[in-house]
């Protein structure tokens, strides 16, 4: 069995911050993986019999190229694929937008605590501290929201510098989502920085 890691970074150096940490997690768990740049994905990779799951990594704040190239991700909706997919930050945005979600500007940088209202992968309902680094959020009714944060305005952005700050339960900004009928998961935060166990669980367990 093999995990396909999809690199969406325009700049090669960003690979070391957003992709390599995920590769390192899988390597330590002795999980076989293949990493490929999103523009180079072909049916050969997607229909590989060894392919079990897919992770779409995030990228830097200044890199929005992937948002202009969503046609490269049409395969996400292929019925014959039917593999669990886990999108991280930009990866979650891609998953939502492919299913015709709405992109909204919402810059969040730093650590906050968010409330998981239901079990999400191996996260039981609880308060979790997560690391955020993004300019945009996504809204999509095809996905169920498992955890969220309040939309930040003006001076409220300063709250992100306080790791003790607890986000609102109003779930205005989805931080953890799952497609209502498909094994497609997304997180706006970066589990490769904090909460590595989420990646280990997705890769190692049987995902419904």
Predicted regions and their residues:
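Short, charged N-terminal beta->alpha structural module
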Residues: 5-28
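Structural motif
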Residues: 6-11, 38-39, 58-59, 188-190
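N-terminal Rossmann-like NAD(P)+-binding domain of SDR-like oxidoreductases, especially those catalyzing
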Residues: 9, 54, 60, 197-199
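Flexible gly/pro-rich beta->alpha loop and the following alpha-helix that scaffold active-site loops
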Residues: 24-87
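Gly/Ala-rich beta-loop-alpha elbow adjacent to hydrolase catalytic centers
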Residues: 87, 91, 96
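Pocket-forming structural segment of enzyme catalytic cores
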Residues: 97-197
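Extracellular ligand-binding/catalytic regions of CAZymes and related secreted enzymes
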Residues: 195-208
